[in-house]
UniProtKB/Swiss-Prot annotation:
Residues 225-277 are annotated as: Disordered. The gene is rplB. The lineage of its organism: Bacteria, Pseudomonadati, Pseudomonadota, Betaproteobacteria, Nitrosomonadales. One of its GO terms (biological process) is cytoplasmic translation. SMART domains: Ribosomal_L2 (SM01383), Ribosomal_L2_C (SM01382). It comes from Nitrosospira multiformis (strain ATCC 25196 / NCIMB 11849 / C 71). Keywords: Ribonucleoprotein, Ribosomal protein, RNA-binding, rRNA-binding. This is Large ribosomal subunit protein uL2. One of the primary rRNA binding proteins. Required for association of the 30S and 50S subunits to form the 70S ribosome, for tRNA binding and peptide bond formation. It has been suggested to have peptidyltransferase activity; this is somewhat controversial. Makes several contacts with the 16S rRNA in the 70S ribosome. It holds the Pfam family Ribosomal_L2_C. It comes from the Bacteria.
Amino acid sequence: MALVKVKPTSPGRRAVVKVVNAGLHKGAPYPHLVEKQNRTAGRNNKGQITTRHIGGGHKQHYRIVDFRRNKDGIAARVERLEYDPNRSANLALLCYSDGERRYVIAPKGIVPGMQLMSGADAPIKNGNALPLRNIPVGSIIHCVEMMPGKGAQLARSAGASVQLLAREGDYAQLRLRSGEIRRVHVNCRATIGEVGNEEHNLRAIGKAGAQRWRGIRPTVRGVAMNPIDHPHGGGEGKTAAGRHPVSPWGTPSKGFRTRVNKRTDGMIVRRRYSNKG
């Protein structure tokens, strides 16, 4: 995997920096593990915009990824690594000894031909999935479940990882990359190692059109709008917002806490790091 700066053959190409991985499969995805994906353009069933700056983009098929890793005790061979347009991480196609194939998030250091396994008796090896009760304290892990059997929810994007800090009774303590320390049940599964494609955040898109290919629409500044459209809008000529930065609906956008899920507050041992005061 390497960062490549392309030749400046046009203004749009001048700033492009791409991540090139020569080991990725160049053909089509495994046909039995893809399904149709309909675009919503950020709208709900009433046609109202619920997520701004989404729309258009190239058609994509969804790759069905195994986030549960519940095929225990059966060895799987890494058949190939593939690009996935739906996420920042790459995928690994596993071929189990009984012939079944599944996609998983590709961990760092995985190459075709390696043997992986899941289950409580799986060896402590990069890419293997085990319950947290069977993983040594201090290990770096990814694809962590938050509820047993629900499937991985934490540390799934490119370069992401979590550290297992401690185990106390039925719960393990995890340190997330944000600095938050969170409690998770020891029966939840996680995969050893960190997610691959860690250079994804170093790429440079280069031009606005490349963002449109990805289904990302422009973001208009509030101060460039009218007062009816945004709290920062209006004024004669170029003017400042005249207040602390807020969202279009008036919620402070700099350092204001918006978490409202009090039901799981007890699972957070320490909140994420903050530079605010």
